Amino acid sequence: MDLRTMTQSLVTLAEDNMAFFSGQGPGETARRLSGVFAGIREQALGLEPALGRLLSVAHLFDLDAETPANGYRSLVHTARCCLAHLLHKSRYVASNRRSIFFRTSHNLAELEAYLAALTQLRALAYYAQRLLAINRPGKLFFEGDEGITADFLREYVTLHKGCFYGRCLGFQFTPAIRPFLQTISIGLVSFGEHYKRNETGLSVTASSLFTSGRFAIDPELRGAEFERIIQNLDVHFWKAFWNITEIEVLSSLANMASATVRVSRLLSLPPKAFEMPLTADPKLTVTISPPLAHTGPGPVLVRLISYDLREGQDSEELSSLVRSEGPRGLELRPRPQQAPRSRSLVVHIHGGGFVAQTSKSHEPYLKSWAQELGVPILSIDYSLAPEAPFPRALEECFYAYCWAVKHCGLLGSTGERICLAGDSAGGNLCFTVSLRAAAYGVRVPDGIMAAYPATMLQSAASPSRLLSLMDPLLPLSVLSKCVSAYAGGEMEDHSDSDQKALGMMGLVRRDTALLFRDLRLGASSWLNSFLELSGHKSRPNLVPTEEPMRRSVSEAALAQPEGPLGTDSLKYLTLHDLSLSSETQDTPELSLSAETLGPTTPSAVNFLFRPEDAPEEAEARDDISTKEEKVYSVRAAFPEGFHPRRSSQGAIQMPLYSAPIVKNPFMSPLLAPDSMLQTLPPVHIVACALDPMLDDSVMFARRLRSLGQPVTLHVVEDLPHGFLSLAALCRETRQAAALCVDRIRFILNPPGPATPAGPTTPPV
């Protein structure tokens, strides 16, 4: 169904339902249902022309006709998903509204939530239109200095997001993955309650499990709490949450479902300099020094994974590098025969926003790769930010890559073909490691497979970045905090000093007491929530006669006396309300002042701001508050009468970031000069159509193709960022993971005669 037909069908159904409920008397329920359908009609009619304009020019930003993908297309697709859900729900209401089994309360809550989502999507469509108007032809990232990114920041950070994390969570993704996203969101908000209590990882996880009942029952509460967490908690919270998968119990469970391999060893590479032959003249060598940045020389951890035991992998030299990971069970299987060295090697760099995870959490899909490809895989455990900011991770990955090239024989490979593979932040490091190898003059890999890579860490507005408003895995503020930590803007958290002082037995005693306390409170909370919900469902009147202690987000908005949709609700401060702050003293003023956005430290790189827009932070704030309001007034963002919903959490702490380090080509490879990009080997990118970082992949591929570099771009539909870690979840993620394996296989076994990219080192 095309966009116009879908919109017309939805409008017709909305008008029919609106007329029906308007004639049901003066009851509150009928009034709210009539009002919500009136809102659906209004937003759908306003959204359709904006989406049509975006779709009419979206093809100009594709890599080619065979790869129709960019942020504009993704926004249109997301809005279509929301319209399709509302169309389905409106048809259901029209068919069942007279039935005695019609669940009025449930359907009303769902319609309200999706109306809020549709309103916010309309705002994003207008933002995308403005980007389209001011961007250079064919450019997805804003590169001008007109101050439009300041205007984006001022408006975007205050948009209401909770509706996307409650009932509408993951509506844009494939249905098979939505239960997983709901589990993640419930775990996140529950984990947030126990964060900073000085509990150990297992205790926090267990406590969160038993106190999450009310978040599972109440989607509106979950959405509001999710919004609070993403806007207020620092990078250390996200580091702790993402590292839950590193807990021994959980990692063991994950490994039980993964492929069984003969070799999975954690190695510690000593910080010793060594020589590498130059590609131009193998008789000459260059010294590869150990990592030095920030913390001085130190070992680099890597994990060797091989489906078969190959020659060299059980050598004494390699065994001397093995690092113990705890007690191992008795090996009862007979010692296998050694397979010959593989002609290929995969060097893998994991993702995690530069701040979290290790090869251990990525081991399940790496084992599958080792089995399917039949080659050894070396995964690098680089040091993480904020404790080890840029360029420490790059130095460690480059050192480990060079060590692997030189000592490939120990890893069970002859090194004829070498592939660099990584996802997200790991994809970024794959590109920069290859650029550094070319700069040193040593062998570059034969190809790079990057899954949903981050190639643009400099702050700049783009249409796909707008998707971060609704993405449960990559919200805008989380992206900002991760990049800030990697750039050195986040200081190390020393809040664990008390844990060290307690000692192991003290931690165990304290965590046991806290766990039993949380079990008791969690059971009570869950029972109260269940009884409250049951009591609510048993009432004949859906709206209680007394004001409850806490209303849902949608109820609070619709219960206001002004207008059918409660447009004056303080839960959703509109742009109009904020612009009248001089007349209403209790409404906060929306500006980029230090009072609004926090201290002017480089602690929050935002993805909607370029450093050029703020060469001097004090001048930039003054300039934005005066000149930018004249040129890009807040009211000019939207048509007359349209006001998106605003967050009750206040502005995200995202001050302007002016450090030039984010423009470093070894940090943002998209900004590298042509001469550097021309040194890259063939690049194969697998991106997600609904990923806030989609434009990174599209623009990087366009840039390489314009230079005549071999590059392919494959875009998978309806999956979130990070699908490799979800490979076993459903058919769609398995197919996407198989595409990554296919790209690696193409690099290792190219059609026609294969020639190494550089001189190979004799196996050690």
Curated annotation (Swiss-Prot):
Keywords carried by this UniProt record: Cell membrane, Cholesterol metabolism, Cytoplasm, Hydrolase, Lipid degradation, Lipid droplet, Lipid metabolism, Membrane, Phosphoprotein, Steroid metabolism, Sterol metabolism
Annotated positions of the Phosphoserine modification: S552, S554, S593, S625, S647, S648
GO cellular component terms, A-Z: caveola; cytoplasm; cytosol; lipid droplet; membrane; mitochondrion; nucleus
Record localization: Cell membrane; Membrane, Caveola; Cytoplasm, Cytosol; Lipid droplet
Biased composition, class Basic and acidic residues, residue ranges: 325-334
Catalytic activity, as annotated: a diacylglycerol + H2O = a monoacylglycerol + a fatty acid + H(+); a triacylglycerol + H2O = a diacylglycerol + a fatty acid + H(+); a monoacylglycerol + H2O = glycerol + a fatty acid + H(+); Hydrolyzes glycerol monoesters of long-chain fatty acids
Post-translational modification: Phosphorylation by AMPK reduces its translocation towards the lipid droplets.
Positions of the UniProt region annotated as Disordered: 316-339
GO biological process: cholesterol metabolic process; diacylglycerol catabolic process; ether lipid metabolic process; lipid catabolic process; termination of RNA polymerase I transcription; transcription initiation at RNA polymerase I promoter; triglyceride catabolic process
Effect annotated for changing D623E: In strain: Large white and Norwegian Landrace
Entries under Pfam families matching the protein: Abhydrolase_3 (PF07859), HSL_N (PF06350)
Record flagged with keyword Transmembrane helix: no
Similarity section: Belongs to the 'GDXG' lipolytic enzyme family.
Protein purpose: Lipase with broad substrate specificity, catalyzing the hydrolysis of triacylglycerols (TAGs), diacylglycerols (DAGs), monoacylglycerols (MAGs), cholesteryl esters and retinyl esters. Shows a preferential hydrolysis of DAGs over TAGs and MAGs. Preferentially hydrolyzes fatty acid (FA) esters at the sn-3 position of the glycerol backbone in DAGs and FA esters at the sn-1 and sn-2 positions of the glycerol backbone in TAGs.
Name recorded for this polypeptide: Hormone-sensitive lipase
Organism: Sus scrofa
Gene: LIPE
